[in-house]
C-alpha cells in the first residue's frame, strides 16, 4: 500500500471495504497497512461504528503524544534549576551584568521549554536550536572554561520534527559526558541535510563514555542516562520509522545520532508558523 510510504497507520487510518476476502488476503491487507476490513454486505450502523473507532484511535494517539510532550517538559531536573539559581545568586555578588544575562537566558529556556506549542505533535529544528542555545549559554557560565561547545550546522537548514527531540541529547552530553571529566570537555552538535527530505543530527561528547554492557540498556527505562532517550526513540520511530544510533567508547566519548526522513506531505517550518498564527 503506497499510502503507507507517506502516512502512518495513526496519521491516516484506512478501512478496506470488500465484497469477499479470504484469510490469506486479509493477512496481506493488514500487512500492507490497513487498519480494519469491512466485508459486504454490511449494515450502515456497523460501518459508522468502524469509522468512529478509527477516529477515536487517531484522537487517542494524538492525546498520548501531547501527554508525552508534557512529560518531557516536566523532566527539567530539579538539580539543574538549583544549580542555575545558585549561579545567578553567586554572580549578583561578582558580576551584575552577567547575572542579568544568565537570568534572561534562563527565562528564555523555561519559556520555550514550556511553550504551549511544544504540546503539539510537531515543532521545527530552529525552534529547538533556540532552546539548546539558551541551555548551553547557561551551562557555559556554570562550567566556565570547562565546557567547550562546537556546532557544525548547515546554514539554511530547517525542518519539521517532534518537539524536544535534540535538547535532551545535548543535556545528556553535558550531564553524563563533560561534567564527569575532571578538566571538562567538549560537546558537538551536527545538523546536515542529506537529501531533499532527509536530515542527519548528531550530538557528541568526549566524556568518559559508556561500557558496551550499559549501552544495551541505554534505551530502556532502567538506566539513568536513558531518561528521555527511550521516549525520543519511540517518537522517532513513530514520526519517520528510524531509530536513535548510539556509539560510545570508554574514556573516549559518546555519540548519539538520528536520521530524520520526511514524507513529501509532512510540511515545512513556514507552514507550521503560519498555522500557529491562525
Curated annotation (Swiss-Prot):
It comes from the Bacteria. InterPro entries: Bact_2-comp_sensor_kinase, CheY-like_superfamily, HATPase_C_sf, Sig_transdc_His_kin_internal, Sig_transdc_resp-reg_receiver, YpdA-like_HATPase. Gene3D superfamilies: 3.40.50.2300, Histidine kinase-like ATPase, C-terminal domain (3.30.565.10). Coiled coil: none annotated. Residues 1-55 form the Response regulatory domain. One of its GO terms (biological process) is signal transduction. GO terms for molecular function: phosphorelay sensor kinase activity. GO terms for cellular component: plasma membrane. This is Putative uncharacterized protein YwpD. It comes from Bacillus subtilis (strain 168).
Amino acid at each position: 500500500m503506497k499510502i503507507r510510504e507517506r502516512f502512518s497507520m495513526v496519521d491516516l487510518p484506512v478501512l478496506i471495504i470488500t465484497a469477499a476476502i479470504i484469510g490469506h488476503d486479509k493477512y496481506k491487507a493488514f500487512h500492507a497497512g490497513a487498519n480494519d476490513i469491512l466485508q459486504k454486505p454490511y449494515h450502515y450502523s456497523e460501518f459508522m461504528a468502524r469509522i468512529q473507532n478509527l477516529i477515536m484511535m487517531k484522537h487517542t494517539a494524538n492525546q498520548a503524544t501531547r501527554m508525552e510532550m508534557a512529560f518531557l517538559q516536566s523532566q527539567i531536573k530539579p538539580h539543574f534549576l538549583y544549580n542555575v539559581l545558585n549561579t545567578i545568586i553567586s554572580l549578583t555578588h561578582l558580576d551584575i551584568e552577567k547575572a542579568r544575562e544568565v537570568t534572561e537566558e534562563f527565562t528564555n529556556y523555561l519559556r520555550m521549554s514550556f511553550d504551549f506549542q511544544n504540546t503539539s505533535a510537531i515543532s521545527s529544528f530552529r525552534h529547538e536550536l533556540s532552546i539548546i542555545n539558551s541551555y548551553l549559554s547557561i551551562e557555559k557560565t556554570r562550567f566556565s572554561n570547562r565546557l567547550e561547545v562546537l556546532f557544525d550546522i548547515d546554514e539554511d537548514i530547517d525542518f519539521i520534527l517532534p518537539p524536544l527531540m535534540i535538547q535532551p541529547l545535548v543535556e545528556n552530553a553535558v550531564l553524563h559526558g563533560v561534567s564527569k571529566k575532571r578538566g571538562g570537555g567538549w560537546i558537538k552538535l551536527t545538523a546536515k541535510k542529506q537529501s531533499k527530505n532527509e536530515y542527519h543530527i548528531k550530538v557528541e561528547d568526549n566524556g568518559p563514555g559508556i561500557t558496551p554492557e550499559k549501552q544495551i540498556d541505554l534505551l530502556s527505562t532502567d538506566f539513568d542516562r536513558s531518561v528521555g532517550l527511550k521516549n525520543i526513540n519511540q517518537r522517532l520511530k513513530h514520526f519517520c520509522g528510524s531509530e536513535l544510533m548510539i556509539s560510545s567508547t570508554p574514556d573516549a566519548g559518546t555519540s548519539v545520532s538520528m536520521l530524520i526522513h520526511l514524507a513529501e506531505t509532512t510540511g515545512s517550518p513556514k507552514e507550521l508558523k503560519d498555522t500557529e498564527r491562525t
